[in-house]
Amino acid sequence: MFELNNFESIKIALASPEKIRQWSRGEVKKPETINYRTLKPEKDGLFCERIFGPQKDWECHCGKYRRVRYKGVVCDRCGVEVTKSKVRRERMGHIELAAPMSHIWYFKGIPSRMGLLLDMSPRSLEKILYFASYVVVDPGETGLNEKQLLTEKEYRTALEKYGYTFTVGMGAEAVKTLLQNIDLEQQSKDLRAELKDSTGQKKVRTIRRLEVVEAFKKSGNKPEWMILDAIPVIPPDLRPMVQLDGGRFATSDLNDLYRRVINRNNRLKRLLELGAPDIIVRNEKRMLQEAVDALIDNGRRGRPVTGPGNRPLKSLSDMLKGKQGRFRQNLLGKRVDYSGRSVIVVGPELKFYQCGLPKKMALELFKPFVMDKLVKEGYAHNIKSAKSIVEKVKPEVWDVLEDVIKSHPVLLNRAPTLHRLGIQAFEPILVEGKAIKLHPLVCTAYNADFDGDQMAVHVPLSVEAQAEARFLMLSVNNILAPKDGSPITTPSQDMVLGCYYLTIEAQDGAKGTGMVFKDFNELLLAYYNKSVHLHALVKLKVTLEDGRSSLVESTVGRFIFNENIPQDLGFVDRKENPFALEVDFLADKKSLGKIIDKCFRKHGNTETAELLDYIKALGFKYSTLGGITVAVDDMSVPEEKKVFIAEAEAKVDKYEKAYRRGLISDEERYEKVIETWTETTDKVTDALMGGLDRLNNIYIMAHSGARGSKNQIRQLAGMRGLMANASGKTVEIPVKSNFREGLSVLEYFTSSHGARKGLADTAIRTAESGYLTRRLVDVSQDVIVREIDCGTEDTTEIYAIKEGNEVIEEIYDRIVGRYTIDPILNPETGEVIVEADSMIQEDEAETIVALGIEKIRIRTVLNCKTNHGVCSKCYGRNLATGKEVNIGEAVGIIAAQSIGEPGTQLTMRTFHTGGVAGADITQGLPRVEELFEARKPKGLAVITEVSGRVEIDETGKRKEVNVIPEEGETQTYVIPYGSRLKVKQGQMLEAGDPLTQGFINPHDIVRVNGVKGVQEYIVKEVQRVYRLQGVDVNDKHIEVIVRQMLSKVKVEDPGDTDLLPGGYEDVLTFNECNKDAIDKGLRPAVAKRVLLGITKASLATDSFLSAASFQETTRVLTEAAIKGKEDHLIGLKENVILGKLIPAGTGMKKYRNIAVEKIED
C-alpha cells in the first residue's frame, strides 16, 4: 500500500508538454474568474468548477446533485463531479499556448542553460526570443551558418541572393527547433575532446557546457522541454479570490498574471486564424512571451509587471523565494494548534521541574483531554454534552482538569530560541491569574527576565511525544549547557547574594562567638532566638553514620548552608578530615557553579535538581534577611583621588609642552596622554577597592557575582576614565568625575558617544548573529552520529592554544571527554594514565596537566570516516549529559547552536592600531564570520611557503625577507609598506609561518600546510575570538563546522571516471568512485581538497531541498531540475519540508523499525 508519507526519496525534473497535459484536468480557455452577480465561478475560466472541482462539498455547479449519496457522479448538465471541495487544492489545469514560449529560468539564469547548450550568448538568444533578429535554423545550400543571427535587412538580402533554399526562424519556435536538433552524445564527445586542448576562459566555458550536456544526457530530460507548449495552471485554492466587506474582491497576484497570459494567448489564436500580417503576429507573440515570463518569474527580465500602487506582482518564483516564500514560511515554519502564549512571572515556590499554567489557558489547551475524562467519569453521556460542560465552566471541570494535567508535561518556549535549551518541558501546576509562572533557575537557559517577556506553551499530544518530553526535555534533564558542559542552571542575583551573605567569613566579636552546640537543631534554635549571630564562629558536634563524632568549628551560616548539601562532593579529602564541612568557603557565583557541577557528576540530575531547589530557597531567604541594599553612603570616594588627578594633569601638561617645542610627535603625545589617564584611572580604582569594607553592600554585590563589576564600582565612586568616540578612537579628555559626584556638561557629552554606539551596535549584532546561526545550522544540519566507531587510525595532536605568552585555551578543556587511540603514559614512571581507546575523564585530564604533558594525540571529528555524519568515538562526550554521545544525536545542529548562541555577546568592533598604515584588526563577530566564510581577511599577513632561516634585507623604504631552507632555493618575500615584521634576523621558521603581523588567508594554509593545517588554524582562531570575550565553547563544535567546510574536493582530472572536471564532489563519494575505477583497472580521477565558506558549502550540498530552502532558491531548483536530481532525504531539513519525522534522535530508522511482539505468559 502506498502511504503518502512512505517514500525514500524525491526527484525533480523538467516537465514535458505531455506531462503537463497529463497533470491537467482540463484547459482554461477564458480569463474570467467569477461571475460578479452570482459569485459563482465562470465555466472554462480560472476558477472553473468543471476543471478544478466543486466549491461546496458534495454539490455540483447547477445544484442538480446535492448530498454525499451522489459521491463521484458527474453532473450531466454542468459537467461538475460531485466530491469534496478539498480537491480544489490539488487539481491542476493548463493553458494550450498558440505558439511555444521559452521558460525564463533556463534562458535567463546565470549561466544561461539554453545559451550553453546552443553555444550562443544570452544576448543573441534574447534577440531571437523577443523577435529582434532572425536565426538560421537550416542553412541549406547557402553560405550561411546554422544559428547565425540575421537582422531584417540581412534577411531580405539573403532572400534575394539565395531564394527559399534556407530556413530561418524567430522566437521560441526557432529555439525549440535548434534544441531538438542537438545530438547530446556527439556534443559530449566533442566537448571532452576540446577540453584536452583548451586553457583559461575557454576551458571554463567548455567545462560549463559539458556540465549542462552531461546533465541532460544522464537525467533523461530533453533540451526542447525548456520551451513550453502548454502552461500548467495551479489549483485555484492556492491562488484564492475572497470577497471583502464592501463587495470588493481581494485576489492573489497569480490570477492577474494568468489572466494576462490567457488574454494574450486568445488574441494570438484569433490573429492566427484571421491570417494577420506577420508583424502583428510577431508583436503579439512577444507580448505573450513577456506575460509568460512575468508569470514564472516577474522582474527577472525588464521592468516587473506592477499591480495597483506600483507594487510588483508576486510570480510563481516569488512564492518560493525568501523568508515569506513557501519553503521558509510554510514548510520549515508552521504554526501549531494546542499552543498559547502569555507574560511570564517568577515562581520561586515552584520545584525545578514545574511551571505555573493559568487556569483559563490550561482548560483551553487540554480541552479534548478534559472532555474525554468527563465522559469516562460519567459527568457527561457523550462528547457533545461534555463540550457544553467545559464551555459553561462547571465546577467539576476544574477537578477533572487537575487530574488530566497531573502527569502531562507541557513545553515552554521563549523566542528567540537560540539553542536547544530555549524549549524545555515542565509539569504544569494550575495558577490563578493570566500569567505563566517560571522557575527562576531556568531563566539563564531561556535568557528570560520578568520585565514583560512572553513565553509560548505547547502541549505534546501523543503518548510518544509525552514520553520524549518527559525523558529528554524535562528541565531536570537539561542542567548542563551543550556548548561547554558547564551547569547552565547556576543560581544568579538574589540567590547568590543570599548564599554569599550566609557563608561570609567569621566576624570578630560577633554575638555568640565560641559557643558549642550538641546538634544542628540546638544551633538553629539559638539562631532563631537571636542568641548567636549568623557570622559567629561556633563549634558543633558532628556525628557520622558509623557513629564517630567530633566537634567542628565554622560559622553558624556555613552550618546552615551545609545542612542539605551532600558531604561527598570532593571539596574535602574525606580520608584526612571525615568531619569537616564540605563547603567551608565563601559561596560566590563561581563556587556555587562548582558545587552544582560536582553534584551532577557524582549524583546525577535528580539529586542535583533537589540541591538546586535547596540553594534557591536558602538564597532567597537569606538575601531577604540580610537586607543587602544600596545607599548613597556606600559609595565612598577615595581621599587620594584629587592627588592622583593633579599629578596626571601635570604630566599631560608636560607632554603638551614637549609637543609644542617639537620634541615629540603628535602621535607620541596622544599615546602618552592616553597612557597617563589609563594609569590614573587604575590607581583611583585600586584606592577605591582597597578602601571598601568587606561588608560594604556594593562590594558584596560585585564580589559575590550577583550584580555589577569592579568596572561599574569605579564609575560610581572612582572616576569614569577615558571614553571612546563614535569611530572607536579614544578621546584624550577623560571623565574625571564619577556618578556620586556628578558629571560636568562636557563630561556628560563625551560619555554620550559611547552610549549611543553601544545601543546601535547591539541591534546590528543581533541581526548579524542570527544570520550567522542560520548559515551554520544549514551547513551542519545533516551531521548526525551514525555509528559507534568508524575505525579510523587517524588522530590529531592537541596542545594548549596560546597567543604570545597568554594561554587562550588550556589543554585540559581540549582533551576532557575525548577518546584516545594509543594509551597515554606517565613520562616519568611509564605507567598508563589513560588506556588505549577510552575516554579521558576529568581526573585523568587533571593528572595529565599536573604531569606537565604538553601534547596529546586524540580522536576528533576532523578525522572521522563516517559518511554523512560522525561516529560517537570521534565525537566523544555529549556535553549536555556528560556521558558518551548516543547514536542519532544531531551533533551538527548542536554545534551550530553552540557557536551561534553566544554570537550576540561578541563585539562588532574593529580595533584601530595606531601607526601610519593604521591597520584595522577585525575582531568579534565579523572575524568569526570571516573565518567560517573562508574569506580573504583584511590586513593580510605574508606567509613563508618553505621552512628555513630568516634573513632580513632593508634597502631604503623597501623591506625584503629571505627564507633560506636547508636545501632547495631561497624564497624572497617583499614586505608591503606599513606592515609590521613579526620575525627576527636568523630565526628558524616552519612552512606556513607568518612573516608580518595580521591574519593569514585560510586558502594559503590549505596550499602550504594542507588540510590539517587549515583545520587547526580555523579552530584556533575562532576559539581566540570567543575566549577573549569570555565565552567558553568546546572545540568539537567548531570542528564539526570545519569538517563540513572541508567535505568537498574539486576534480582536476576525471581520469576514466564519470566525474566532471572542475566539479565539486564529496570527499567520501570521490574516494569510493576512485576505488571502483581502480578495481576495474581504469585510470582514477585526480582532485584536490577545497575549503568552502559555510554559505557555499550549504549550497553545494547533495540535497536540493535543503539548498533551495536556504538561499538562491530559483538557481538551485533550475540546476536540480536539469540534472534530474534525486534527494535521498538524509538531512533534517529535507524531512521537515516533506513533513516526515527527522532522521535523528528517536526518529532514526534504527529506532523506528521496532515491532512489538506479545510473548505468551
UniProtKB/Swiss-Prot annotation:
GO biological process, any: DNA-templated transcription
Binding site for Zn(2+) 2: 790, 864, 871, 874
Cofactor(s) demanded: Mg(2+); Zn(2+)
Catalytic activity entry: RNA(n) + a ribonucleoside 5'-triphosphate = RNA(n+1) + diphosphate
Entry superkingdom: Bacteria
Alphabetic keyword roster: DNA-directed RNA polymerase, Magnesium, Metal-binding, Nucleotidyltransferase, Transcription, Transferase, Zinc
GO terms, molecular function: DNA binding; DNA-directed RNA polymerase activity; magnesium ion binding; zinc ion binding
Cofactor note: Binds 1 Mg(2+) ion per subunit.
SUPFAM superfamilies hit by this protein: beta and beta-prime subunits of DNA dependent RNA-polymerase
Enzyme class (EC, first level): transferase
Binding site for Mg(2+): 449, 451, 453
Gene Ontology terms: cellular component: DNA-directed RNA polymerase complex
HAMAP family per the UniProt record, alphabetical: RNApol_bact_RpoC (MF_01322)
Name of the featured protein: DNA-directed RNA polymerase subunit beta'
Lineage of source species: Bacteria, Bacillati, Bacillota, Clostridia, Peptostreptococcales
